Amino acid sequence: MKSVFTISASLAISLMLCCTAQANDHKLLGAIAMPRNETNDLALKLPVCRIVKRIQLSADHGDLQLSGASVYFKAARSASQSLNIPSEIKEGQTTDWININSDNDNKRCVSKITFSGHTVNSSDMATLKIIGDD
């Protein structure tokens, strides 16, 4: 009986290691609580500058209305790029991938991503989750 348990545990651990090795490079970069009033200074500052090639946006706890987004790179000139984002994200919905670093300079690292927008159709503040892929 003990050997059956040991074999089962070994198989479970092997499966976990196998799946971890094949995991993608998608990482939750952070989340922003979206106020009910339109705000244009919502920022996600990355504590460690990281190379991010594309992002996805996801809404939790309510619907979001977005009017703009920009990504800022760590560079001497504080380079930035405006992002083409959807104007609305429904609760539980995740956007398609949004490409950044599109000027073929994939070595620039992202220091901050800013958003303009607010929560709609909810008494709670919705949460905007930002998922990155490097």
Swiss-Prot record:
Leader sequence residues: 1-23
Family matches, as Pfam families: DUF2541 (PF10807)
Key words of the record: Signal
Family: Belongs to the UPF0412 family.
This protein's name: UPF0412 protein YaaI
Organism: Escherichia coli (strain K12)
Name of encoding gene: yaaI
